[in-house]
């Protein structure tokens, strides 16, 4: 596809199968786990496996493949086993992505576990200040994902994300993945034209739109400021279709990857349904309208 719309794809049977799966459902971009997302240790692909993955990527004609780190990682954890395992796992993620040729990693910033926001952010920054120099061959970008703010999770405010980026020794290596479900659940209302303009103006002021490098497009089963992360099919949750219409017609984000993480079925049916829903929201506009960056 010519657009930058896609979905998270399974790596069952080998990561090399993911590009064709994405192509089959009509993706222009895809996201993958590079290992089992619920295990600490993952297998490093051989040179041959990595070459096959890159060949399949090219054959599928995808603009980009983005990696998502495993869910177990918590770089905000205090010193101890979880932090040690998290550092090792993220380092391995960077190494795998280097071998595979993937230059973008999405990650959840972490949870402070009751030690406070400031302490958690400091620990995240300290972790990255160790990790970036440890894997110099990874020259890509790490995307901090906006979170719903469940429990003690960090990343549910733009201020927190800005503090993490500014607090590292390598701010140029970091950007943001904007998850629509998470951000809405965290209290940012972009379901109206006015709200949409306000939220992205605030993002631009605190972080910069140049650092918005990926969207996770998900509707939400829960309401505004619920602090609960529950994804729903596009247009069938509490967000509704309007914010997705705004995003799909915002020229500032035309070439920013937009990845579905909506519920899966037994086959490709739901991914195809959600991709079609989003593409139907794109409207034909005049040249004058295309110069207007925000929804009317």
From Swiss-Prot:
Q: Which GO terms describe its molecular function?
A: deoxyribonuclease IV (phage-T4-induced) activity; DNA binding; DNA-(apurinic or apyrimidinic site) endonuclease activity; phosphoric diester hydrolase activity; zinc ion binding
Q: Which residues form a coiled coil?
A: none
Amino-acid positions noted as binding Zn(2+) 2 in the UniProt annotation, renumbered to this chain: 145, 179, 216, 261
Tell me the cofactors it needs.
Answer: Zn(2+)
> So what does this thing catalyse?
Endonucleolytic cleavage to 5'-phosphooligonucleotide end-products
Positions binding Zn(2+) 1 in this chain are 68, 108, 145
Record's keyword terms, sorted? DNA damage, DNA repair, Endonuclease, Hydrolase, Metal-binding, Nuclease, Zinc
PROSITE patterns (alphabetical): AP_NUCLEASE_F2_1, AP_NUCLEASE_F2_2, AP_NUCLEASE_F2_3, AP_NUCLEASE_F2_4
Task: Give a GO biological-process term.
Answer: base-excision repair
Cysteine disulfide links = none
The residues that the entry says bind Zn(2+) 3 are 182, 229, 231
Gene3D superfamilies per the record?
A: Divalent-metal-dependent TIM barrel enzymes
Tell me the enzyme class. hydrolase
Q: What is its EC number?
A: 3.1.21.2
Give the signal peptide range.
Answer: none
**Record carries keyword Hydrolase:** yes
Cofactor details (free text): Binds 3 Zn(2+) ions.
Give yes or no: UniProt keyword Cell membrane.
no
Which family is this protein grouped under? Belongs to the AP endonuclease 2 family.
- Tell me, in a sentence or two, what this protein's role is: Endonuclease IV plays a role in DNA repair. It cleaves phosphodiester bonds at apurinic or apyrimidinic (AP) sites, generating a 3'-hydroxyl group and a 5'-terminal sugar phosphate.
Protein name per the record: Probable endonuclease 4
| The species this protein was found in | Geobacter sulfurreducens (strain ATCC 51573 / DSM 12127 / PCA)
């Amino acid at each position: 596809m010519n657009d930058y719309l896609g979905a998270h794809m399974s790596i069952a049977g080998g990561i090399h199968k993911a590009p064709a799966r994405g192509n089959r459902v009509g993706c222009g971009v895809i996201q993958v786990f590079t290992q089992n997302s619920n295990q600490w240790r993952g297998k490093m692909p051989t040179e041959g496996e990595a070459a096959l993955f890159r060949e399949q990527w090219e054959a599928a004609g995808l603009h980009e493949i983005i990696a998502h780190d495993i869910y177990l990682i918590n770089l905000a954890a205090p010193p101890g086993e979880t932090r040690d395992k998290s550092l090792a796992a993220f380092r391995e993620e960077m190494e795998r992505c280097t071998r595979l040729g993937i230059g973008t990693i999405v990650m959840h910033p972490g949870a402070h576990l009751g030690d406070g926001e400031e302490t958690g952010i400091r620990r995240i920054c300290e972790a990255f200040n160790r990790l970036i120099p440890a894997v110099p061959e990874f020259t890509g970008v790490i995307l901090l994902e906006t979170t719903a703010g469940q429990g003690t999770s960090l990343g549910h405010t733009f201020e927190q994300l800005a503090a993490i980026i500014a607090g590292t020794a390598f701010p140029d290596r970091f950007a943001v993945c904007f998850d629509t479900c998470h951000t809405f659940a965290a209290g940012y209302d972009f379901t109206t034209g006015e709200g949409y303009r306000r939220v992205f103006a605030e993002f631009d002021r605190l972080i910069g739109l140049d650092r918005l490098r990926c969207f996770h497009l998900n509707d939400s089963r829960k309401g505004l400021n619920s602090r609960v992360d529950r994804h729903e099919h596009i247009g069938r949750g509490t967000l509704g279709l309007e914010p997705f219409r705004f995003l799909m017609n915002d020229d500032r984000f035309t070439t920013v990857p937009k990845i579905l993480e909506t519920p899966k079925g037994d086959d490709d049916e739901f991914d195809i349904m959600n991709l079609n829903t989003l593409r139907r929201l794109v409207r034909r506009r005049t040249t004058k309208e295309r110069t207007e960056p925000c929804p009317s």
